[in-house]
Amino acid sequence: MKTGNQFNTVALVGRSNTPGIAEPLTTLAGCIAKLGFEVVFEVDTAREIGISGYPALTPAEIGARADVAVVLGGDGTMLGIGRQLAPYKTPLIGINHGRLGFITDIAAADMQARVPVILSGKFEREERSLLEARIVRDGEPIYHALAFNDVVVNRSGFSGMVELRASVDGRFMYNQRSDGLIVATPTGSTAYALSSAGPILHPQLQGIVLVPIAPHALSNRPIVLPDDSKIAIQIVGGRDVNVNFDMQSFTALELNDTIEVRRSKHTVPFLHPVGYSYYATLRKKLHWNEHASNEDDTAS
């Protein structure tokens, strides 16, 4: 926990194309402004909700000017703005206005009570890791991207299995026939990787998990690697193969293309309310321990 006012400018970012989001964002902006903070809006958010009276900034301008960003939306909104603000080390406060909300941990109904407390300097800070990836074709890099959750190489449409050659730190691991391969951060271990039978990695664990998607050989199991590993995935066989970054952007691949993945030098700071518990999040979102007991951790 940290105390002491260290924020002056607060950026507000909202989930796009979301009916009903204008009112809570406008209310929150007024609440924060009354406390003496400068409030700015992400430019697309300001345009969508039609708000005026506050500066409308691009993500790069937010990174240069704002001390913290409050994100009202779902996990996808956090992933998108998190990647863009990572180079600026802008801390994020997540308010859940989506469905699952693994990384937006403040309920929308509680935001007017909880956000001012965090902005006053009372919070728990957590650094989340990112992946950086590049696609190499004919020996030349043709595309770069950051991923907060995962880098996913997979087949598309009705095409058959793909064959992938995976290497770690220049050492051959395996050739794999499957529907694809997920490279996930600890944050991403509760996303697509989890639905493909991957393990849950605590966010503070320094690791990267490789998770096959519907492998032809059942002996191809997920593996957790050190987070300084350099992973290379080559397209050996198959057609209509794509690589996705947080399932929000993708590019088509060709035979012999290689996707190189490693941990990014950037991290994304999350600011949680005091008393935040990752285990409480798992219980709530994954419906663990449905029958409460006296031994339950009551932290939210």
UniProtKB/Swiss-Prot annotation:
GO molecular function, one term: metal ion binding
EC number annotated for this UniProt entry: 2.7.1.23
Single GO BP term: NADP biosynthetic process
GO cellular component: cytoplasm
Active site: 75 (proton acceptor)
This protein's UniProt keywords: ATP-binding, Cytoplasm, Kinase, NAD, NADP, Nucleotide-binding, Transferase
Catalytically driven reaction(s): NAD(+) + ATP = ADP + NADP(+) + H(+)
UniProt-listed SUPFAM superfamilies: NAD kinase/diacylglycerol kinase-like
Cofactor(s) required, per the database record: a divalent metal cation
One Pfam family recorded for the sequence: NAD_kinase
Subcellular location, record wording: Cytoplasm
Top enzyme class: transferase
Keyword Ribonucleoprotein belongs to the record: no
Binding, NAD(+): 75-76, 149-150, 177, 179, 190-195, 214, 248
UniProt keyword annotation of Cytoplasm present: yes
Superkingdom of source: Bacteria
NCBIfam families, per database record: PRK02155.1
Protein family according to the UniProt entry: Belongs to the NAD kinase family.
Function: Involved in the regulation of the intracellular balance of NAD and NADP, and is a key enzyme in the biosynthesis of NADP. Catalyzes specifically the phosphorylation on 2'-hydroxyl of the adenosine moiety of NAD to yield NADP.
Protein known as: NAD kinase
Organism encoding this protein: Burkholderia ambifaria (strain MC40-6)
Encoding gene (name): nadK
